[in-house]
Amino acid sequence: MPVNNKDINILGIETSCDETSAAVLRNGCELLSHIISSQIKTHQKYGGVVPEVASREHILHLQSVVEQALQEAKMGFGDLAGIAVTYGPGLVGSLLVGVAGAKAMAYGAGIPLLGVNHLEGHIYANFLHNPGLKFPLLALLVSGGHSHLVYFEGHGKYQVLGQTRDDAAGEALDKVARTLGLGYPGGPYIQKAALEGNPHAYEFPRAMLEPGSLDFSFSGVKSAVLNTLNSARMKGETVNVADVAASFQEAIVDVLVRKTLLALARTKAPTLVLAGGVAANTLLRERLTEATQKRGIAFSYPPPILCTDNGAMIATAGYYRYLDKDYAPWNLNAIPGLNLA
């Protein structure tokens, strides 16, 4: 594919947790390549991500993943306008691998380095999938470590309206799935088991917090499920795993939808976008689709491949930083506890 000198080609690199990913994006909307090296099978035997193992895997695979992305895009570093990389939040060792690699590549190629907040990256997956998105909009970001409601007035202009106070939705899903013996990562396993279950078999609590709050809390529902399972075990009773999974999923989705609708009513945002790993949950998509259609609100969500951690979303967020000339300094460092500012 010929390269036009006027094209803005961005290489995106993602290594915040257990996926080593790189993608080449042209002009913010044309994905030329997208490579993901997943570590799920490596970590499954441990029941979760082992940070030291994750960072070693990134070291082993980053160079080849980037080379594959460039080869598939039929480009070299000289064809790139900039290199975008996740610098937080995430596992510090994993982040350092990506940041160090991106800095070396960008410096060697003489092109800008673009630091991307991993959480922003998830939200910007929607701009890749739906380039026609208009502001203002509300974003519901739900992943393994984060649950946020964010109001966007424009690129780089946003306000966090609510966030998790304890366990994020994805974290709760992982812990319950592990206890049920369903496997890792928990979200897809809970969803699959729930298909055969009764979502009203158990009435698990919904933590709405104080009136009007847009924050989330999922530690209570997680604990309620674990207590139910422990109680049954102590009594020698069996539980229907599908019913527990379905009832638990129902409680999680119910809270997410109710809080999101409250935020939409408060902000009067005409558009809602869904992002993060839990955004791949079918029930959550269906409930939000139904609710937004009733209210005349536009609703966008990316395909599952763009919901989990990936380089394409980082390239997309990096593209908009490039347009604003918001380049990262060469002393950019990993910030594992980075928040949405």
Curated annotation (Swiss-Prot):
Cofactor: Fe(2+)
Binding site for Fe cation: H118, H122, D309
UniProt: substrate binding residues: L141, V142, S143, G144, G145, D174, G187, N281
Keywords: Acyltransferase, Cytoplasm, Iron, Metal-binding, Transferase, tRNA processing
Superkingdom, taxonomy of origin: Bacteria
Cofactor-binding details, from the entry: Binds 1 Fe(2+) ion per subunit.
EC annotation from Swiss-Prot or TrEMBL: 2.3.1.234
GO cellular component, one term: cytoplasm
Primary subcellular site in the record, as a coarse category: cytoplasm
Role description: Required for the formation of a threonylcarbamoyl group on adenosine at position 37 (t(6)A37) in tRNAs that read codons beginning with adenine. Is involved in the transfer of the threonylcarbamoyl moiety of threonylcarbamoyl-AMP (TC-AMP) to the N6 group of A37, together with TsaE and TsaB. TsaD likely plays a direct catalytic role in this reaction.
PANTHER family xrefs: TRNA N6-ADENOSINE THREONYLCARBAMOYLTRANSFERASE (PTHR11735), TRNA N6-ADENOSINE THREONYLCARBAMOYLTRANSFERASE, MITOCHONDRIAL (PTHR11735:SF6)
The protein, known as: tRNA N6-adenosine threonylcarbamoyltransferase
Organism of derivation: Desulfitobacterium hafniense (strain Y51)
